[in-house]
Amino acid sequence: MFGFGIRQLRGYASKTDLSKIRNIGIIAHIDAGKTTTTERMLYYSGKTNRIGNVDQGDTVTDYLPQERSRGITIQSAAISFNWQNDHRINLIDTPGHVDFTFEVIKSLKVLDGCVTILDAVAGVEAQTEKVWKQSYGIPKICYINKMDRVGSGYSRTVKELMIKMNQRVVLANMPLFKLDPVTNEQVFEGVLDVVNMKALRWDSTDVNKVDIADIDKFDSSLLDELTKAREAMVETLSEFDENLVEHFLEDAEGDYLKVSPTILNSSIRKSTLSQDITPILCGSSFRNIGVQPLLDAVVNYLPSPLEAKFPELNEDIPISYDKRKGLLFDNNSEICVAFAFKVITDEIRGQLVFVRVYSGTLKNGHSVYNSTNGKTFKINKPVIMHANKTEDVQSLSAGEIGVLTGSTVFGRIETGDTLISHSMVKDGLKSIERKGNLNLKINPIIIPPPVFSVYIEPKTLGNRKAMEAALKILVTEDPSLHVSQDEETSQTLLSGMGELHLEIARDKLLNDLKAEVGIGKLMISYKETINSTTNPVIYQDDIGYKFTIQIEPLEGEEVRVDKDTATEAWYPLGVDNNYLIFEKSNKPGLGAVWKHQIPYDVVINTIKSSCLASFQRGGKIGGYALHSCAVRIKGDFEVPYDATSSNEILNITRKLIIKSLQALHESSYSLLEPIMDVEIVVNQKFMGEVIQDLTGHHKANILSIEDEHGLDYNNERSTLNFKDIVDSQYLPPDITLNLAKLDNGGDRCKVIKAEAPLKEMVSYSNKLRSLTEGRGMVYMNYHGMKKVTPERLDDVLQG
């Protein structure tokens, strides 16, 4: 019934049945308790013999010096442990700070399920909303943490989740309080298990002791609450599960309390996997309450690799599941496909490449083909990671998350690469190639664009090579950092997602990589774009080269993925929403039947390099790199059949692109600036002054003003009848809210949502603290690039 009991120290159990593997991540807003919860999971699973503490800087997953000194998660960490004896949980703890969004995006790419942690006092916060949207398609369970805090609101938070995320829920457990006779206050002591109809109370003096009480020991008020919750659970699940309806009417004789916990768990699992509902649990991880039921829920409700969504591929290849072998690409049980989602450099072990194996087995000593960059190498020393510690294994099987190490992988794999190997034969790539599967690629990770930059210069000319090597390591580990060079001044520019992001990069560059560099002041990453399509420019010579090039502006949402239609192929160029468009010719000898000496992929990659270098030269307003532009290569292009080098292609296309851009008048360019989504939480007595300051001094556009825990039934995701669904959902009374004096109108908080130029919001948190006596909070997320209006142009250019 319950997966927890006597805690025993356990090692890693290899080769677990696929159906008993859970690849999960923990996602939440910063300070919701992700790392604290992870530490308890490791302790109660027997993985560790002590509980680490964030404030003391001794947690397992936050092991970087910067993480321990700042008390925040900066990079995702992977660790494996067992639960319920035979289930293995591969857990990735992700950052909550907005500057490290890419770490979350990388992790979501390879996860099968998520645990969303909410702060019971703060409710559904900005970063939680963002990551919830990013994790669309991934089944989730929700854990409401910090139920011991004054002002915690379990039901308020559940209702907020339902409305903001347009999500149905079932209450798997609810908070259990007791009255403290000394203080006469309600104290959180455990949970009411709705599935098993039990009360679980944790001993405050012994972290390993849990008292489990049967239903006959409940007082009438608790029994009434639990009965209502059980009724609501059965009613909700019955909407999605006919088997439950049949069991309820026949076996349970229409009695909600007689419905079997086994049947309920099965029904919750089914509806969670289909994402019709999200199970809700609660606890206080810091007080060691509620973590074991959360682990039970991970095993009981979240998908195994056999039940997870299929990875998205670059081409139409059939994917299926075999109950014994796992995922099959093109019905080929011999092909092993893995995805590299993270690369880090360890000063002792060298380069570590984190991979998720989707099909087959990745074996030590086997040849591997990187279908993203065309490189081939042999696997040496695969390992399982336990935060910053490794465990050697001989292979990584389908569904597993592991790490490739050793000199054979160095420089051959980057984040987002697809790896292909033969599961049975060491050098079996030829047989995979014969079946046409060697070019299979899992769609890459979308890298968000940088919004801040700093100039980096070597302290002496002799330090330049060391600086470039250090920057290469930095960008390999974190592709959301971007290094570029000003062709006119030869200055090196490092760009990132935010002030903290670049501050951490600076620390690593100076302290970890020992780079002898000088670092300039923080600057905003402006871009330029063109407003009209250029005239075609043509090159043709007697040798056999012919290119017709046109450059056009792009409008609409930033997507940055390969697109292939019947008439043209689109290739993304870096992170600035630029594309290379190849028109498909009707002439034989091109495209799929290319028979030239120089490979077709080399031609494409060479022209991509031309585009990137040319766009980096910048526009005519401020010399900023180009954004949202497309280079179109007309379908009549020609390359000599006997050409073996790409140098001529590089020179020709680059000159054509530059010529095309130079032909445009300055008036055909526009300056782009980053716009931020801004969310400010402020006491309502300061609201007027804050709004006046935002609109008057920070060029903000106010989108909405809401109560902090207000419920907007009119959000774009809600359906017409969703208000009725939310209102009919049974939720227990929030008996602790009165302690927070939330009924005092003067203490109520408002949430101001706005859009504002990043330039106007730099260091705004200091201004907000001054306006609100230190009580205001601001959250910002990148919204997109927007053209600077003519009246603001001079102000922006002058800094």
UniProtKB/Swiss-Prot annotation:
InterPro entries xref list: EF-G-like_DII (IPR053905), EFG2 (IPR030851), EFG_II (IPR041095), EFG_III (IPR009022), EFG_III/V (IPR035647), EFG_V (IPR035649), EFG_V-like (IPR000640), G_TR_CS (IPR031157)
SUPFAM superfamilies linked: EF-G C-terminal domain-like, P-loop containing nucleoside triphosphate hydrolases, Translation proteins
Domain tr-type G residues, every copy: 19-306
Gene3D superfamilies, sorted: 3.30.70.240, Elongation Factor G (Translational Gtpase), domain 3 (3.30.70.870), P-loop containing nucleotide triphosphate hydrolases (3.40.50.300), Translation factors (2.40.30.10)
Main localization of the protein described in the UniProt heading: mitochondrion
Compartment list: Mitochondrion
Role played: Mitochondrial GTPase that mediates the disassembly of ribosomes from messenger RNA at the termination of mitochondrial protein biosynthesis. Not involved in the GTP-dependent ribosomal translocation step during translation elongation.
Protein name: Ribosome-releasing factor 2, mitochondrial
